[in-house]
UniProtKB/Swiss-Prot annotation:
Residue ranges of domain AXH in the record: 203-345
Name of the gene: HBP1
Chain residues forming the annotated DNA-binding region: 434-502
Chain spans, region Disordered: 150-182
Protein name (record): HMG box-containing protein 1
Length: 514
């Protein structure tokens, strides 16, 4: 068996492997059969057709491996399947009613969808550009597309439970041993990991290290009951409560405070030390302990009972911590690390598909990214065009209604388009029209519109918008900054997912001028 490597003389050239098989081992003839892979990847920058040979003498010695003829390949792809395309010819419009098991039999399933997207030029995993942590991250999604299955798999029941709060978490002098941002330099996916002795806890590797209960460093506490009712940093409180060993720790003043979780009673945004913060009030569930008010950062993640990761600003949280989150609501119960519900809870049906795999934090973040890309791609193609069939065969067509209703909606959209075209205007309900992302004020108004509507029951929506606009003008720059950052991140994500949307907008504007 002879191996020969042929490569192009250029930085990112695609290498071709020529495998020369010796048929004499199979008892046939002495002729040689040449098997060559000549797939030219269009996603490779600067590729040309140079076939210059380069002999490599420092290759390691290769040994032939006898394969078992009784074992069949786990994944088989037909000749018309590539790393970027679907076998479109094998599908038709009548496949939307085929159950999911049939798709698996045809070897086209959810994992195949992710594999095709992962190897496409648009995939962030295939891009070599390096992102700065302070710059807007391109991997972000709205709160509707966020899902908790991006979490690493829960700890198996066979693993032994450790104490909920190891003492080195309470010691400022003992730093976390290894803290890194997984895949930050390659794909821009930020997933902070804490690989310390408490990795066996319910806190997965992607969970940020807490100082006390569910609160991160930089949080300020104010207990409504007790000897000290003044504001104090969570680091100082943890250091005052912590002792030399676990037994002394149990004798702390607030021993077991909120051990079953902290229920959110109220929340508001304020400015503390020149920085916009969240002021949250929690109920520990016991009258004798009293309430707790905290001031935390806007992107602070919380693990909510029966809900998973949650945040007041999911877009900021996924940028800062790499944790996809749902939105926080009044009444949510925050769980501390090591809580039984935090270890065993999993609300994702899609996540069951991946339970048999041993995901690292980097892998789980990649799963979230690719899955989010797949959903966004299907959503953008579901309303019409040639991509509509892709959405119909994906198994998610149930969310779009029956075929009859789809045809009816398409007909109505077409009728509106013809009517608007005849009057010289551009249809705003075009099937390929992308929604413009919300700006900072729209995000602000969305958050407070319900509250102001309840405050002024006699006013209509337009009057409420005027009131919201007045409050927006009176806000300080640091108070507006959080909405500006979130709007900028959403705009970057919209540009990444739908680059043609912005071009089409400019084209429509120019056509209207003519």
């Amino acid at each position: 068996m002879v191996w020969e490597v042929k490569t192009n003389q250029m930085p990112n050239a695609v290498q071709k492997l020529l495998l020369v098989m010796d048929k004499r081992a199979s008892g046939m003839n002495d002729s040689l059969e040449l098997l060559q892979c000549n797939e030219n990847l269009p996603s490779s920058p600067g590729y040309n057709s140079c076939d210059e040979h380069m002999e490599l003498d420092d290759l390691p010695e290769l040994q032939a491996v006898q394969s078992d003829p009784t074992q069949s390949g786990m994944y088989q792809l037909s000749s018309d399947v590539s790393h970027q395309e679907y076998p479109r010819s094998s599908w038709n419009q009548n496949t939307s009613d085929i159950p999911e098991t049939t798709y698996r039999e045809n070897e086209v399933d959810w994992l195949t969808e992710l594999a095709n997207i992962a190897t496409s030029p648009q995939s962030p995993l295939m891009q070599c550009s390096f992102y700065n942590r302070s710059s807007p991250v391109h991997i972000i999604a709205t709160s509707k597309s966020l899902h908790s299955y991006a979490r690493p798999p829960p700890v198996s029941s066979s693993s032994k439970s450790e104490p909920a709060f190891p003492h080195h978490h309470w010691k400022e002098e003992t730093p976390v041993r290894h803290e890194r941002a997984n895949s930050e330099s390659e794909s821009g996916i930020f997933c902070m990991s804490s690989l310390s002795d408490d990795d066996d806890l319910g806190w997965c590797n992607s969970w940020p290290s807490t100082v006390w209960h569910c609160f991160l460093k930089g949080t300020r506490l104010c207990f409504h009951k007790g000897s000290n009712k003044e504001w104090q940093d969570v680091e100082d409180f943890a250091r005052a409560e912590g002792c030399d060993n676990e037994e002394d720790l149990q004798m702390g003043i607030h021993k077991g405070y909120g051990s079953d979780g902290l229920k959110l009673l109220s929340h508001e945004e304020s400015v503390s030390f020149g920085e916009s913060v969240l002021k949250l009030t929690f109920d520990p569930g016991t009258v004798e302990d009293g309430l707790l008010t905290v001031e935390c950062k806007l992107d602070h993640p919380f693990y909510v009972k029966n809900k998973g990761w949650s945040s007041f600003y999911p877009s900021l949280t996924v940028v800062q911590h790499g944790i996809p989150c749902c939105e926080v609501h009044i009444g949510d119960v925050r769980l501390p690390p090591g809580h039984l519900d935090a270890i065993n809870f999993d609300d994702s049906g899609v996540f069951d598909t991946f339970k048999s795999y041993d995901f690292t934090p980097m892998d789980s973040s990649a799963v979230y990214v690719l899955s989010s890309m797949a959903r966004q791609r299907r959503a953008s193609l579901s309303c019409g065009g040639p991509g509509g069939q892709d959405f119909a065969r994906s198994g998610f067509s149930k969310n779009c209604g029956s075929p009859g209703s789809s045809q009816l909606s398409s007909s109505s959209l077409y009728a509106k388009a013809v009517k608007n075209h005849s009057s010289g205007t551009v249809s705003a309900t075009s099937p390929n029209k992308c929604k413009r992302p919300m700006n900072a004020f729209m995000l602000f108004a969305k958050k407070y519109r319900v509250e102001y509507t309840q405050m002024y029951p006699g006013k209509d929506n337009r009057a409420i918008s005027v009131i919201l606009g007045d409050r927006w003008k009176k806000m300080k720059n640091e108070e507006r900054r959080m909405y500006t950052l979130e709007a900028k991140a959403l705009a970057e994500e919209q540009k990444r997912l739908n680059p043609d949307c912005w071009k089409r907008k400019r084209t429509n504007s120019s056509s209207q001028q003519h």
